[in-house]
């Protein structure tokens, strides 16, 4: 039995995530399975505002933005798995553990984001995340995200 790939285009992503330019860091979802995993891409362009200061002579995509891109991917997986937050709820990044940066990411690279759902306990979800460029891991981390009323 084969399973059809599930994808999301940018319009569908914007319907789920509250982030907008310059902070929307997921361009396309290439595959996902509810309550299991999500794969997405982030195209890194020299035209992004962070490159004016990080670093002008040798532009490098900030590691914290790689982690944020992975967190946004976890949000997409959570929303497709358990439903989008209510109007009085917020889904936010709660913690990062075991973050490792292995190679710099530069303009022209395409980040492949892979997040895996591990468990949910009292509204706090645990995920493993990996970011790759050309098949090589550039970043990995454990991410926790929380869904809370405000």
Curated annotation (Swiss-Prot):
Its main location: cytoplasm. GO terms for biological process: fatty acid biosynthetic process; lipid A biosynthetic process. It comes from the Bacteria. Its EC number is 4.2.1.59. It holds the Pfam family FabA. SUPFAM superfamilies: Thioesterase/thiol ester dehydrase-isomerase. It is found in: Cytoplasm. One of its GO terms (molecular function) is (3R)-hydroxyacyl-[acyl-carrier-protein] dehydratase activity. The active site is at residue 54. It catalyses: a (3R)-hydroxyacyl-[ACP] = a (2E)-enoyl-[ACP] + H2O. Keywords: Cytoplasm, Lipid A biosynthesis, Lipid biosynthesis, Lipid metabolism, Lyase. It is an enzyme of class 4 (lyase). InterPro entries: FabA_FabZ, FabZ, HotDog_dom_sf. GO terms for cellular component: cytoplasm; membrane. Involved in unsaturated fatty acids biosynthesis. Catalyzes the dehydration of short chain beta-hydroxyacyl-ACPs and long chain saturated and unsaturated beta-hydroxyacyl-ACPs. PANTHER family: 3-HYDROXYACYL-[ACYL-CARRIER-PROTEIN] DEHYDRATASE. Belongs to the thioester dehydratase family. FabZ subfamily. This is 3-hydroxyacyl-[acyl-carrier-protein] dehydratase FabZ. It comes from Aliivibrio fischeri (strain ATCC 700601 / ES114) (Vibrio fischeri).
